[in-house]
Curated annotation (Swiss-Prot):
It catalyses: a quinone + NADH + 5 H(+)(in) = a quinol + NAD(+) + 4 H(+)(out). It is found in: Cell inner membrane. This is NADH-quinone oxidoreductase subunit H. It is a multi-pass membrane protein. The chain crosses the membrane at residues 14-34, 82-102, 115-135, 161-181, 198-218, 258-278, 285-305, 321-341. NDH-1 shuttles electrons from NADH, via FMN and iron-sulfur (Fe-S) centers, to quinones in the respiratory chain. The immediate electron acceptor for the enzyme in this species is believed to be ubiquinone. Couples the redox reaction to proton translocation (for every two electrons transferred, four hydrogen ions are translocated across the cytoplasmic membrane), and thus conserves the redox energy in a proton gradient. This subunit may bind ubiquinone. GO terms for molecular function: NADH dehydrogenase activity; oxidoreductase activity, acting on NAD(P)H, quinone or similar compound as acceptor; quinone binding. Belongs to the complex I subunit 1 family. It comes from Allorhizobium ampelinum (strain ATCC BAA-846 / DSM 112012 / S4).
Amino acid sequence: MDSFVSTYVWPAAIMIGQSLLLLVCLLVFIAYILLADRKIWAAVQLRRGPNVVGPWGLFQSFADLLKFVFKEPIIPAGANKAVFLLAPLVAVTLALATWAVIPLNQGWVIANINVGILYVFAISSLEVYGIIMGGWASNSKYPFLGALRSAAQMVSYEVSIGFVIVTVLLCAGSLNLTDIVNSQNHGLGTMMGMPASLLDWHWLSLFPMFVIFFISALAETNRPPFDLPEAESELVAGFMVEYGSTPYMMFMLGEYAAIVLMCALTTILFLGGWLPPLDIAVLNWVPGIIWFILKATLVFFMFGITKAIVPRYRYDQLMRLGWKVFLPLSLAMVVIVAFVLKLGGWA
């Protein structure tokens, strides 16, 4: 009995506890990221933004949560009720499940699997199913058109993201996310006489791929200027037009969980994860989790600024950018990086 408890029960209890702790921290972080998104937009438009609920509006997201929860969910008359209610649950579950393999610091990961980046890519590809289910089950033309746009958009830009990840894997030599971060301890900066610095991170040596990944992440998460699935001027609110109350809140939660995931993934692949920008004692004293959060927040700030200042693309422009610009460019970069690594004897 003791061996059964120590072998199965205790490890399972630890994993459940870690998952719940990560979930609570992630939800609180998303609440404040949502507030930051609104504040950035307000600052660009010379407004104050949310500033009533709590000091400086810090509790605005929690007030919105209560508002959504206590509203009555309304299901359209011709909708498929089961699929209509299941769609937001699928979207938010898949968005949160991806975080199981994201390392926040050295050893701070629930499942440190050797194919972590492949798991993230596979699960994030499934998130479009929640949107398609919601658009189809609403029995309305605007949600259905928004769902079709979302499917085409996500498929188009996942190809470019896949090639970007391949170039990072060629440089890191591993599919494990922790190993990818640790591989950025040496690189271009080490050759220039600045070992373990921000010049070693992949953002510099793979700068074109960093730009492609950032723009593709905007399209993958339906962020402006690529928010075609929910374009207000054309599709009212896209696939969410028939949703309200808690289901709408769950769609929004899944969307922002995916956005924060892309920020974390950008940090891991290109910005050195939890590594400090310089190998000096003062910066090494700062816990790695702090560096990780600061870098992910910086990437989200770039997301927010892009949303506020860049106008929306037309649908044909979006598709042309993905298939005629990013796809050939990312494929060419894979070949170039592989050739350079082989030529330099690093492969």
